Amino acid sequence: MMNLLIEGKILSKFKKARSIALVGTGGNLAIAQHMASDMYRHTGKFCFAPDSVNLTALGGDGDWKSKWLDYARGGADLIIAITCRVESPLTRQLVNLDNVILFAPDYHDTIPTIRIESTYYHEF
């Protein structure tokens, strides 16, 4: 069961946010894109995620995640990251940010996390 303090912190961050950036890598990027659309439709909050055009433009410059996160920090009140590994390269880039929620199979030590329990992670 999720810690109530963390659960309250996650809910508070979401309620306060006017704009939300979602990010993931691989299959989680597709989930982030779909989730951004659904979140906008159900909440009316401005939600966005990188798409293949962004990745093509940023990908040639090496680590696209850093560049995209810089962009997201400037345009979003909240960043939601989706990952299969709680200690992924993406997660390490988010550790020092206050406005982050993580979706992952396990809880992160410092980032408020919504734990996705499933046998096959991409089937939630």
Regions inferred by a protein language model and the residue ranges of each:
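A short, well-structured juxtamembrane/interface segment
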Residues: 2-17
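Glycine-rich phosphate-binding loops that contact phosphosugars or nucleotide phosphates
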Residues: 21, 25-124
